[in-house]
Amino acid sequence: MRAAHLVWAALVVASAASGASAAQVGVHDPVMAKQGARYYLFSTGPGITFYSSTDLTTWKPEGRVFKEGPAWATRAAPTFDGHIWAPDIYHHDGKYYLYYSVSGFGKNTSAIGVTVNTTLDPRSPAYKWEDQGPVVQSVPGRDLWNAIDAQVIDDAKGTPWMSFGSFWGGLKLVKLDAGRTRLAEPQEWHTIARRERPAFTPDDEAGPAQIEAPFIFPKNGWYYLFASWDLCCKGKDSTYKVVVGRAKTITGPYLDRNGVDMARGGGTLVIAGDSDWRGLGHNSAYTFDGKDYMVLHAYETADRFKQKLKVLEMGWDRDGWPVLDQKDLNRYQSALQP
């Protein structure tokens, strides 16, 4: 997320505003994992904030992943201030890999790092995050892509891939090595989604190609690529929305419902804002206990457009496209556990 830290204030939001729902969890860019009977939620914030829950509704604050920013972060992003963006949590072979982004606002002076733990339970004696450093870095003037908003997934053969990107030349997919902490060699890159970037846009500017936050979700022989279009983090003026395409292979092409390649500007709308909720986006998607869910943030009109967590059950139409019920935005309300 390019601008989350400009409006990110308190992760725990309580408001006395008329009609507002109090004591909900306020997050940007939420991702989840389940260990045992407990869910863990990670989000953009100082040091990466996280919560735990047993029911996906009531959440207990668990502090921060990083007490101090990664030691290498200011070398990659000299203006880094400890505010870590867009985490992704991934489990493999008994380890949890937490990918995250450091960046300079409005520039592609960015990098994606990863830290590893054997447990998500902060009360376990085995709990210890061990940072592995940067996985990939973008440099202004060299790269026409932005190394933020990572998601990692294994394909059907067990090969790990990282999708990422924001604005510039769109969303990328790159193969990871067997250790899941570095790019595989020889490197293999794909552009999986983009929007039109006008010619002669300076390379060091994000430009108006408003797309970011890829998330690939496998289902029934398809890979579904979710992405966020338009603008986050502008309160009532936020225009974020979630779009999707799908492919039979993880490298694409990802086609929307009309057969348009997302790498050529395609994308089928999944959910957008309404009068009660603005700026829906930066979603993740999971299957928990046989049900599919979309997890995202949204800004609540009745609470001065503060960011709130949304966990929405996701269905599928007869043609195999994801379906959400807009009314669930009001039905789902997280609760902060004291």
Model-found features: residue ranges?
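Bacterial N-terminal signal peptides that target proteins for export
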Residues: 1-7
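N-terminal signal peptide c-region/cleavage motif recognized by signal peptidases
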Residues: 14-18
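Carbohydrate-active catalytic/glycan-binding domains of CAZyme proteins
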Residues: 19-338
